[in-house]
Amino acid sequence: MAKLHDYYKDEVVKKLMTEFNYNSVMQVPRVEKITLNMGVGEAIADKKLLDNAAADLTAISGQKPLITKARKSVAGFKIRQGYPIGCKVTLRGERMWEFLERLISIAVPRIRDFRGLSAKSFDGRGNYSMGVREQIIFPEIDYDKVDRVRGLDITITTTAKSDDEGRALLAAFNFPFRK
């Protein structure tokens, strides 16, 4: 079991119970899932780019990504409906906790010119979204084998009812928010 999951059960639940005066432990917000999305718009011209992006996402998450397809045709971007334009992975359970642990302790500190994550990236319902400009911050990616630096979106979905609860949950995990 991931250390972060044990830490959540032992420390974070108690801390949030006292902070928000919950009656039951089931009211305490928890991390539901983490979604990693990598948009590869250049895949229209070269299908190999999408395969490389999928391989990177597999290395980062430990799970085979789902290839996302265009929902509708857009002439300006030269895409048609059904064209493969990206890939995504949804992490739950043990893999989710392990990824969150690696993200907080290893990947985020390796971001170039890092001054903290924005605390304003909550959606109003306690879910947090962040963008990463380079996939090479993850230790699983071999820098020499990278064909192109790609970014990815990371969405942390929680059971929190408000942004304050979601922010308190992630802050309890020592998320490096900007002051």
Curated annotation (Swiss-Prot):
The chain's coiled-coil residues are: none
Q: Superkingdom of the source?
A: Bacteria
**InterPro entries in the record:** Ribosomal_uL5, Ribosomal_uL5_bac-type, Ribosomal_uL5_C, Ribosomal_uL5_CS, Ribosomal_uL5_dom_sf, Ribosomal_uL5_N
* A GO biological process held by the record: translation
Q: Ubl conjugation: present as a keyword of the record? A: no
What are this entry's molecular-function GO terms?
rRNA binding; structural constituent of ribosome; tRNA binding
Keywords assigned by UniProt, alphabetized: Ribonucleoprotein, Ribosomal protein, RNA-binding, rRNA-binding, tRNA-binding
- Keyword match Ribosomal protein: yes
Instruction: Please give the GO cellular component terms listed in this UniProt entry.
Output: ribonucleoprotein complex; ribosome
Q: How does it assemble?
A: Part of the 50S ribosomal subunit; part of the 5S rRNA/L5/L18/L25 subcomplex. Contacts the 5S rRNA and the P site tRNA. Forms a bridge to the 30S subunit in the 70S ribosome.
Q: Which family does it belong to?
A: Belongs to the universal ribosomal protein uL5 family.
* Function, as annotated: This is one of the proteins that bind and probably mediate the attachment of the 5S RNA into the large ribosomal subunit, where it forms part of the central protuberance. In the 70S ribosome it contacts protein S13 of the 30S subunit (bridge B1b), connecting the 2 subunits; this bridge is implicated in subunit movement. Contacts the P site tRNA; the 5S rRNA and some of its associated proteins might help stabilize positioning of ribosome-bound tRNAs.
What is the name listed in the Swiss-Prot or TrEMBL entry for this protein? Answer: Large ribosomal subunit protein uL5
Q: What organism does the record attribute this protein to?
A: Pectobacterium atrosepticum (strain SCRI 1043 / ATCC BAA-672) (Erwinia carotovora subsp. atroseptica)
